[in-house]
Amino acid sequence: MSGPADSIEIQNVVASTGIGQELDLEALADDLPGADFNPDNFPGLVYRTQDPKAAALIFRSGKIVCTGAKSIDDVHDALGIIFDKLRELKIPVDDEPEITVQNIVSSADLGHNLNLNALAIGLGLEDVEYEPEQFPGLVYRMDEPKVVILLFGSGKIVITGGKRTDDAETAVEEIVERIDALGLLG
C-alpha cells in the first residue's frame, strides 16, 4: 500500500562549496563558454550544467552555490563538472572540495483535501502561519526535523529546509500523524 511518503519528490537541492581563493569574474566570464555575468543585476557569475541540470552561482570570493539539482548526487556531479572547467582554466581546485547541503525542497501529496482553518487551530498557533488573504497555504514550522511545511487545501505539501533526503520522509510521516490525530485527514 502506498502512502503520502511514497509521493515525495525532490524539487531542488541547494548546496555550497568554495575553492578557497578570490576569482576574477570578468575574466572567468570571458573564458568559460556559456557563463552568464551581469554584475549590475547579480554579483555572481551563473554557469549552468545540462546533465545534470543545475546552476552554479560563482562569487568573487571563490564561494560557489549550486541550485536547481534534483538530488544530492546531481549536486556533486554538477559541481564536479564546474571544478573540472575551473581546473582546465588553470584555476587550482582541491581534489575534493567540501560540499555542504544547505536546503532540500521536496513536494508530496497527502491524498486528501485539507481543512486549513481547522488545521491552523489544531496544529497550534505558535507553529503555524495561515493568512489565506496573503498566501493560500498554511505554513507549519516543525522542530524535528527542522523544516517548514507548506500545506495546501488540495492535500499537496512542500517541505523546505531539509538537510538530508530522509528529512522530507520524516516530516511527512510526522505531519500525517499530527493531522490524523486531529481527525482532519480525509
Swiss-Prot record:
GO terms in the biological process aspect are: DNA-templated transcription initiation
What keywords is this UniProt entry annotated with?
DNA-binding, Isopeptide bond, Repeat, Transcription, Transcription regulation, Ubl conjugation
What Pfam families is this protein classified in? TBP (PF00352)
The stretches annotated as sequence repeats are: 10-86, 101-179
Where does the record put the Glycyl lysine isopeptide (Lys-Gly) (interchain with G-Cter in SAMP2) cross-link? K53, K63
Q: Which domain of life is it from?
A: Archaea
What's a Gene Ontology MF term here?
DNA binding
Which PROSITE patterns does the UniProt entry name for this protein? TFIID
Identify the SUPFAM superfamilies for this entry. TATA-box binding protein-like (SSF55945)
InterPro entries the record matches: TBP, TBP_archaea, TBP_CS, TBP_dom_sf
Q: Which family does it belong to?
A: Belongs to the TBP family.
Q: What does this protein do?
A: General factor that plays a role in the activation of archaeal genes transcribed by RNA polymerase. Binds specifically to the TATA box promoter element which lies close to the position of transcription initiation.
Q: By its UniProt entry, which PANTHER family does this protein fall under?
A: TATA-BOX BINDING PROTEIN
What protein does this entry describe? Answer: TATA-box-binding protein 2
Q: Lineage in the entry?
A: Archaea, Methanobacteriati, Methanobacteriota, Stenosarchaea group, Halobacteria
Gene name of the encoded protein: tbp2
